[in-house]
Amino acid sequence: MSYNSIYDIIGLNNEVNRLETQAKLGWSKEFRALKWLGLKDGMKILDVGSGPGSYTELLLENLPNSEITGLEIDKNLLSIAKDRLKDYPSERLNFKYGSILNSGLKENSFDFIICRFVYQHLEKPLAATREIYKLLKPGGIVAIIDSDRGLYGVSEPDILFKSGRGFISQIERRAKWNREIGRKLLKILKYEGFD
């Protein structure tokens, strides 16, 4: 994993704020897309890379009969998520410390797995996909949401966007993120047996 080095650059509080904003900005469109893919209330859901719990909280609020497990490799973010969502009963919400590569979660446990902006940090995306496949119940669904810097689609970026991209590129290089993972996801999924 290459995630923690972002703290050296922007600090934990700024990273939590960034993740909170990221979760809220795309929520309405993402939630519609997740429902279109088959997400339904009452499902058992795994949120891989649950971070500070921002997205997990949105899932809990919009799926009141679902049981959600947040899996997070970063102890700082996991602690923030647990504190933030401590009022939810354990029948609805569980958090697990660990990587998707060795989660310790029971195979065939989840109806729906959501993996948002995690693959760009993975050194072994094929192994992660293999583990996700094992964790899904038969007929289960995985939704991988990630980025690809080649798909931004801004025809004439303004000066602020250009300067922001320079800063983001610095973070990407230092953290060794794979910001072109989006174009590889379909091949990875097919290779690991997803239809």
Q: Where is each model-derived feature located?
A:
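Class I SAM-dependent methyltransferase Rossmann-like catalytic core
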Residues: 3-27
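A short acidic, Gly/Pro-enriched loop at the edge of an enzyme's catalytic core
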Residues: 101-112
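A short SAM/SAH-binding and catalytic strip from SAM-dependent methyltransferases
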Residues: 111-125
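Conserved alpha-helix/loop element of class I SAM-dependent methyltransferases that forms part
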Residues: 24-41, 58
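A short glycine-rich, Lys/Arg-flanked "PGG" loop and its adjoining helix->strand segment in the class I
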Residues: 126-141
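Conserved catalytic/acceptor-binding region of the Class I
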Residues: 143-195
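Class I SAM-dependent methyltransferase SAM/SAH-binding core
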Residues: 46, 52-102
